[in-house]
């Protein structure tokens, strides 16, 4: 075959491939024609609207207002269907098969988290969910209270140095506290992030969160071939090696310890947990999330170390920044709403009496009913994960012949749902009492932890942690608005953050 013939064959193959892609694209778009399309640039589509993470929420809210809760957004490489419509959300979030898998963006976490619960698909996800659920059992959660307490104590000592200043960025302190908490509860080790924030592990966690966000918002870095040419690619390889090495070393040490302490290695049932730990779960050795995985079984065999590492790393990623953001925004809301703060403090006085320095107990946390309303209202206005996406695994008929094609990426816009004035009148107002009577409201009208089978498995753990840390702050400090007055500049990253910090003013709390 001559060189000319080879070129002709290659050219023909390219034409056939391009033709197939074009026909498939048009067929796909025909199926989606029932969904309102957001007008955009003829070449770049709507991608330029998302140049800054601080624009994302405004842009998506504007789109959905124009299109009544459902719209198609063109991001060049892929169309996204953005949703705040409750009926379609119910279909998506209650699906046990059709919309169970996460969208393609989650692959950016694959090198770090592997097939952990956040990124897992199909059967792996089902098995993992079943294995991990006992780790968030009532009797396990009780033992973590002392961990919340000791790490919150460290944060209070650090915050005391900020008393009297016009403003302090509370987020900086809170996220290191939640990182310490998640490390100790998940792996059973103290990393002392609050007092040693420059450790290799802490730095690697922060950088991996940044790299993942940057890649998700970069048209170039989204493509594997082009991403491999960037500095972040090589940084990611280095940071992932650091993170994996640390987790693996902890797994080896905990496995050795458990083998010497236990002869039985099966998933703990409720009765066994009572027998081993007693009602208070304080008399014997604490069980970290990792210890429970080391005792678990998959098809009758112990979990492989790789499987365990992926799940522990996933909990680390999901469990520190989300909770840190929620606590920080809650403290900001309390500083800006002094009447609400006064009521929250009164509840703390009722629980703790004259001894504000007493260690919090699990029963104390359960008694913090008003503080729970404060947390719910905070998560309504500032949901830690403002949107998340699912992929359809086959063509799905929604209603009246309306088709959601296979491979469609559907973005669940939790921020828009939570701030819908038809569901929550006067949504800008911080009003915890609106959650006193929510029985008649659709479970899909409020999505701080998602909903359905792929909801947040650790939501009770997160709320308990938030209560313990916020309670500790309220018993030690009076929260006031920062000076000059601060308004968070919301940025949709891996979690909802504020590009200009989350600032308050601190004064010593007079308890007597």
Language model: regions and residue ranges:
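Cytochrome P450
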Residues: 2-16, 74-81, 139-150, 160-184, ...
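Conserved cytochrome P450 K-helix/beta-meander segment immediately N-terminal to the heme-binding cysteine loop
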Residues: 412-439
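Conserved cytochrome P450 catalytic core segment spanning the I/J/K helices
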Residues: 48, 59, 137-139, 240-327, ...
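Conserved cytochrome P450 K-helix E-x-x-R motif and the immediately C-terminal K′/meander segment
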Residues: 47-68, 245, 249, 358-402, ...
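Cytochrome P450 heme-binding "Cys pocket" and the immediately downstream C-terminal segment
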Residues: 338-341, 459-497
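N-terminal membrane-proximal hinge/A-helix region immediately C-terminal to the signal-anchor transmembrane segment
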Residues: 2-127, 142, 146-158, 235, ...
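Cytochrome P450 heme-thiolate "Cys pocket" and heme-binding signature region
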Residues: 134, 318, 436-466, 490-493
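Central I-helix of cytochrome P450 enzymes
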Residues: 178, 182, 187, 239-248, ...
